[in-house]
């Protein structure tokens, strides 16, 4: 027996048969061990053929194990050391298999030859099992012919090439017949263009090119459904579309040439079908370089000749980037395909597409989807999710909203869950009190038992209601699933022209199920008041999902949030003292945005704050962020003093290709991509280079910016605040108490025009001037600083009391009109905080005491009260 003449699977079978003999303590290697190894082979050819002969493989394997246990065993120390010896009948199997292989005109002995040789052998154990399971040679040969086709065994791994399309592909026509594909709405023009290209004599290979998520694969599924319905030209009727799985084709190809062998087997099957099979390769760019190792060919070069001759009908699908990167590079491959551009559908088209899918989602999740939710999904996804494409992002929203409602149905309602937890806690308390003997414990036990019985009654009532509601929803889901299955049967009956079945389904079963669904829906609507479970996806759920994804508040305003927004101006004024004009402008911009009245193509607001240092420009941005997001973390702060050189623009949007830092992205673009709803603070903008302002033009006008990788970043949900000290010397001259003098305003405006270009200033929503602080405002600021100190001391249970005289001295000593409120803060830190800290460390001030702050002469003194 020449081992080189055996296929890899046969060599594996011999090894497996030896392992079986050792496992069962058999000293002789019999044909039965070989038979067992063939049947036990996972994903092997023999189990596949036997399965097609309608033989229960599990039962067959159990029978073989029983037979192996009954064979003579050799036990003891001697048996351990001695090997396993092949019998004469075992060797005869291979002699017979060699002659069978010659009859088949095969170059190698394969597993099917071994199986046929075993069938012809004299082993009584094998014959007994074959007879018991009715495994006959003629039947085996018929199924083998179906699996092998006209292929010959001329390689060492032929089993991997049998039924190659079934193994490495998916029959879309079969899926369409079984009602497994989602309905495809619209896209008629694209499908017609594909049909025209497929009907050509040569170069009949369309490649669908479009952005990810626009529905390229869905269009091919739509074509498969049309072929099933017969809604195609005569030339495409009865064609089969096979979707090739490149991953499965490459996976497990260990040796050089194995991948090419598999692909050749697939192509041979397509060629032998004489144009009946159309091959669909999703992500077709993967064929360029797929399976390529040193010295071997890639998949692209293997299919080129067949594409050129028109022997292979192939449809590809890829994105613009991948087409340019892989297919366009290979000009010979590119010219063999005809591009079909798939554009992103409009919002209206997306609504139609989702309406077509609505029923499938309702059946899967067992819920109902409102039409308003479908419209909201299309419109809101287009507006707020800018880095993905329709209809994919809108379908994802509907799917996730359905999943959210479904999980809420499956889990206990909050009210019922809290009652069950309370009962559990009371049961524990009851057990503890039962062990106590004092009168108070006995009284508490009596009260507890009454409360517990009331809660248990309530729990019983609510659980019954919950179970009833859940049962109604599950029944509705089952009815909808049944209706979907019956519709699939109707389509099949119409294709097969079974008129009796069509009449029975169309006029008997389907109307009956529909009337049951209507009855259930009426019942659910009637009892909807006070329902514990929600089984509808509405606009609100879609808004919630978008808010989770992006962080942008899209949900309808609830009462608490309305009050918070209406109070926003007062909240800002309480922290930013004396700058009412700036506070009003910013809070009004936020109100417009949340009410949906802002221009959807521009940022929420873009402002430039002008004024001397320390008057509250940066503080306003921080306070706004704290009020909107409950933290200052969502502020994106860019210090423009770091962008004084011309080349530093690249730090904002990312370095160009070939430069260090290209992969990292820009500081501004990456920050906004991660947090699309945020406050962006460009501090000290006059310090930046002139060229930096050129990138602001797109942000301020269209609310977008393209980064170094060509991706668009959306600024439409950002508040842009820029601060500058330009004209601060003029503002310090302002003598007007309740505002800014007109002459001062004109001087500041002229200074601004001298520094910035008109196209930049013209795009800003508002230029706000901050006036110097008055004495009254300084006192209020001191109160804010002291409140911060009080809050810190409160943690230690220490009370701080400051006299008015002390506050006046702080204002006099700490405030400087040129430097603003910052020196005042430093003064309070140095004089007040430092003195308190020293006394805490000494132990003079301790937890629970009161501190008084007063003056003595021109000095602030601190002491215990």
From Swiss-Prot:
Residues 6-71 are annotated as: Repeat 1. GO terms for molecular function: ATP binding; ATP hydrolysis activity. Residues 395-529 form a coiled coil. The keyword Magnesium does not apply. Residues 773-865 are annotated as: C-terminal. It is found in: Cytoplasm. GO terms for cellular component: cytoplasm. GO terms for biological process: cellular response to heat; protein refolding. Residues 561-772 are annotated as: NBD2. Residues 3-150 form the Clp R domain. PROSITE patterns: CLP_R, CLPAB_1, CLPAB_2. ATP 2 binds at residues 611-618. The keyword ATP-binding applies. Keywords: ATP-binding, Chaperone, Coiled coil, Cytoplasm, Nucleotide-binding, Repeat, Stress response. Residues 163-344 are annotated as: NBD1. Residues 86-150 are annotated as: Repeat 2. It comes from the Bacteria. InterPro entries: AAA+_ATPase, ATPase_AAA_core, Chaperonin_ClpB, Clp_ATPase_C, Clp_N_dom_sf, Clp_R_dom, ClpA/B, ClpA/B_CS1. Pfam families: AAA (PF00004), AAA_2 (PF07724), AAA_lid_9 (PF17871), Clp_N (PF02861), ClpB_D2-small (PF10431). Homohexamer. The oligomerization is ATP-dependent. Belongs to the ClpA/ClpB family. NCBIfam families: chaperone_ClpB (TIGR03346). PANTHER family: ATP-DEPENDENT CLP PROTEASE, HEAT SHOCK PROTEIN 104. The Clp repeat (R) domain probably functions as a substrate-discriminating domain, recruiting aggregated proteins to the ClpB hexamer and/or stabilizing bound proteins. The NBD2 domain is responsible for oligomerization, whereas the NBD1 domain stabilizes the hexamer probably in an ATP-dependent manner. The movement of the coiled-coil domain is essential for ClpB ability to rescue proteins from an aggregated state, probably by pulling apart large aggregated proteins, which are bound between the coiled-coils motifs of adjacent ClpB subunits in the functional hexamer. This is Chaperone protein ClpB. The gene is clpB.
